[in-house]
């Protein structure tokens, strides 16, 4: 239903062309949170980009900096947030999942602050794990499980092995969620982390308030789908 509705909305859009307007001076530049950006776009959280390209998360951040747009570092990034900040001078935001363990969650917020981020993007529509049918069909899991199907895929893609897999193991070892605290960090070859730890079904606006109370910078919520929740977000001190 959601897919059908999304397609219907896009099909209903029309471009209204106006003429005889002076467009000799035009710019896509705008400003958000007191900083100029080249266009009203930002790189969304892109976890596991390192599976596609060696140092993929760093490459994304550098590309965003060159283009003059924000880049959002993901909680599930394969590269530590501190390494991304050090490697890429740009407008970096951080995406946060509200873990079940509130002490771990708040300690993680402090780590994000210490790393130098000034904009926090809190994901609120992940109370349960996603039903990704294409992942089930392909056998892809997070963390990776070296099944016969996966091993066959790796062996038939020697280019990826040379460009991505080999550098990863030589520099960092097995793929892992680099930002996870030791208490429930797991290598991508270990048993998958329980969604009950990372996707709390008890999250509420009080959790947002606790983070807002300690976060000094800009704070956004990701995943709002109704105007009523937008109003609540504003009432709870969100910037967007």
Q: Predicted regions span which residues?
A:
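Glycine/aspartate-rich loop-and-adjacent alpha/beta segment that forms the canonical ThDP
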Residues: 128-148
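N-terminal capping/small domains of soluble enzymes
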Residues: 1-127
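An N-cap/entry alpha-helix motif that binds or orients negatively charged groups
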Residues: 1-34, 143-203
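Glycine-rich phosphate/ribose-binding loops and adjacent secondary-structure elements
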Residues: 207-240
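Short, hinge-like loop/turn segments at secondary-structure boundaries
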Residues: 89-92, 111-112, 138-141, 237-240
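Alpha-helix-loop-beta-strand connector modules within alpha/beta enzyme cores
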Residues: 66, 82-93, 146-149, 154, ...
